[in-house]
Amino acid sequence: MIYNSKELEKKWQEYWAKNRSFEPSEDFTKETGCPRGKKYILSMFPFPSGRLHMGHVRNYTISDAFARYYRQEGFNVLHPIGFDSFGMPAENAAIKNGSHPKKWTYDNIDYMKGEFKSLGFSFSKDRELATSDELYTKFEQGFIIDMYEKGLLYRKKGFLNWCPSCHTVLANEQVIDGSCWRCDSSVVKKDMNQYYFKITQYGDELLADLSKLESGWPKQVLTMQENWIGKSNGLEFKLSFDEKSLEKLDNKFDTFSVFTTRPDTIYGVSYAALAPEHEIVSYMIENALVGSDTIEKIKEMKNASSIERQKEKSGIALNLHVVHPLTKKLIPIWVANFVLMDYGSGAVMAVPAHDERDFDFAKKYNLPIKAVIKPFDGESSIESAFTEVGELFDSEMFNGLNSKDAQLKIIEHFEEKKIGKKTTNYKLKDWGVSRQRYWGAPIPFVHCDSCGIVMEKKENLPIALPEDIEITGEGNPLEKHPTWKYCKCPKCDKDAIRETDTMDTFVESSWYFLRFCASPKNWLNEAFSKEQIKYWMGVDHYIGGIEHAILHLLYARFFTKVFRDLGYLEFDEPFNKLLTQGMVLKDGAKMSKSKGNTVDPDAIIEKYGADTARLFILFAAPPTQELEWNDNAVEGAFKFIKRFYERSVNAIKTNTIPKINHASLSKEEKFARKKVYEALVRSREVYGEKYTFNTMIAGVMEAMNALNLQTNSDVWSEAYWILTSIMEPVIPHVCSEISSVKFSLKNLSSQIVVQEVFVEDSLMLGVTVNGKRRCEIEVPTEATQDEILQIARESASKWLEGKTIIKEIVVPKKLVNLVIKD
């Protein structure tokens, strides 16, 4: 048998397509459907950029191995694929190439679907989707209306993250180290209207339910989400302006709120700081209560990214004062760049002696530093901030308390005096979802002079994008369209303006896994049904990159909880198990066109075949670790497949696994059987918990080496019956070919481990003479102690000549020790 990858792979890809081999059953009853139940296997779907990269190939190879394994095991498997097809790259391509975003997107989808087929991925064809399909948009717009009616979507004006290159707003989660998550441009702040999802309403539940995921999600992801939600308990209270400051502010403001997680430090407050965007600061600018230089500096602070504002501390004194709520001393007010409006109230009490940030600021501007907490075993110092817990002093009635007790007592004191209260704050902020781009799902609202913001009627959905647009990269094409935005108000039927912002593309990926559950029979009529959702969800294995830990994964959890509360489903969490695969590297760096270190999957398939690419990816490294591309290892994978295929001639044709009398076999034949079944046991462990495909494949290679040491055709046939079943999820084309020729595909099913192969006929024991290891002996497993000693004496005879054995010790299953004297 000569291995021809092109011929084999084309044959089986056509067979699978013709026989609809990967469509799940719609019969959900255990009696007539799949008795073992369901498995929902899902990889994070791709943006249709035009060509798959090796990161994609790794992602989908892992999920495909899971899907094929569970089909063999008798489960009803849903393994769908789709395309996250809205987004800015399509518009950027339109500007660069003069192509329409829609054409560019769907041409790329067609090409990538061909790549999926050429790699042998076992996706359900009936449930393919693209999030830019009008049907998908229709259902999503309906959900948006439901969320608006529930009070979970609102519109307000505020300072937003703005990417000057992408010309659109970014959510907080999409700003990475002060830069745009997509194009890496520096992000600035811009004052504008924005739609928000009330994700903060679910902050407590999103945090608490992380405990439900501890057995199935990587700890790193759980920690990242916990830190992003950032729940903190503390004291909220108001600071009151003194008479002079009230007068300066025209009596428009008499107080402002601050929040602190360290109420035990309150006696050490030496200044208060406002965010540049704070309403008091804005009022002073609008009413010329500060000079032009100050106004200019404040504008610079506003335009800086949140990351930049945390680096170099800067501030401006406002010549305002507030009264300390306990000591009644005056506290100066500053504008400080490190204070952000999207945490707490946009105002902080500053305690330089016990906060490093406040300390740096105070040192820079020569502000007082007053220590009020000292270490339990030492004195206080003002050379650096003491941020640990300690003992209070110079704190009136709270002197001598430790920090933890003092926090509780001080909060109680504020509540008794009705000047403050215990409060919980979150770093998590509401999710801003409107984008000033064309290629996205239109937000289904209109602006009416008489009625305000009005929801579109559901019978008018979808609100589809116009195709006759011009994309220049300047401004929002929908805003500039001559007719599309003009419409009638759904409420009063007067002239109105359609909302021209489109949805953040993370909205589409927040529910696509639910859409895949829809029955193809009702695909056009409903987004999904409760019956289908109840059967398929949650996703049993979800595979994707860790870079989505606080974007997609958090948003998907939020949408699931919202949909539950809207009555669409009855569970809390969407993904039972999460596998975050490592990056694919070449020359020690992440693959990228700019570095010139990419590998084209099409070229690998052309030269070696899809099975080689799949085998290398699963064998080179465990899926959670980084994978270093190695051309020699790819060549090695190809050679193994070639040998595996060609040596199948040693197996005889049969429709059942051969029955073998193990006791009658030679030592080499028994060893070969043992190695085959060891590989089978390893495969069960891989799909259960470990995910170490490399150890499973290594086990198959060991079995092949053992098989080559014997010639029994029954042993070869049994081995190939099992090994092709083990390897079919990894190299499906060649295994399907071997199985069809030798076993009529009967063996691609769950295999039974034969325990007798692990029972050893003999044992190897070490023999020591006066404590020195001299040789090894092989003894029958059932040998008596006298028989073992007889064999040991014979094997060690040359060390015993002329000597007297004075003691013989047998350590069961380990060694024989002979003690001698001259």
Swiss-Prot record:
Q: What is its EC number?
A: 6.1.1.4
What GO biological process term is on the record, naming one? leucyl-tRNA aminoacylation
Catalyzed reactions per annotation: tRNA(Leu) + L-leucine + ATP = L-leucyl-tRNA(Leu) + AMP + diphosphate
Could you tell me the keywords of this UniProt record?
Answer: Aminoacyl-tRNA synthetase, ATP-binding, Cytoplasm, Ligase, Nucleotide-binding, Protein biosynthesis
GO MF term list: aminoacyl-tRNA deacylase activity; ATP binding; leucine-tRNA ligase activity
Give the source's domain of life in one word.
Answer: Bacteria
This chain's source organism reads Sulfurimonas denitrificans (strain ATCC 33889 / DSM 1251)
**Group of enzyme by EC:** ligase
Tell me where in or outside the cell this protein is found: Cytoplasm
Provide the protein name: Leucine--tRNA ligase
* A single Gene Ontology CC term: cytosol
Similarity-based family? Belongs to the class-I aminoacyl-tRNA synthetase family.
Q: Mainly localized where?
A: cytoplasm
Annotated motif 'KMSKS' region, positions = 590-594
The gene designation is leuS
Show where the record puts the motif 'HIGH' region.
46-56
Q: Where does ATP bind?
A: 593
PROSITE patterns cross-referenced by the UniProt entry: AA_TRNA_LIGASE_I
- Mind telling me which InterPro entries this protein's record contains? aa-tRNA-synth_I_CS (IPR001412), Leu-tRNA-ligase (IPR002302), Leu_tRNA-synth_edit (IPR025709), Methionyl/Leucyl_tRNA_Synth (IPR015413), Rossmann-like_a/b/a_fold (IPR014729), tRNAsynth_Ia_anticodon-bd (IPR009080), Val/Leu/Ile-tRNA-synth_edit (IPR009008)
Q: Does the keyword Endoplasmic reticulum apply?
A: no
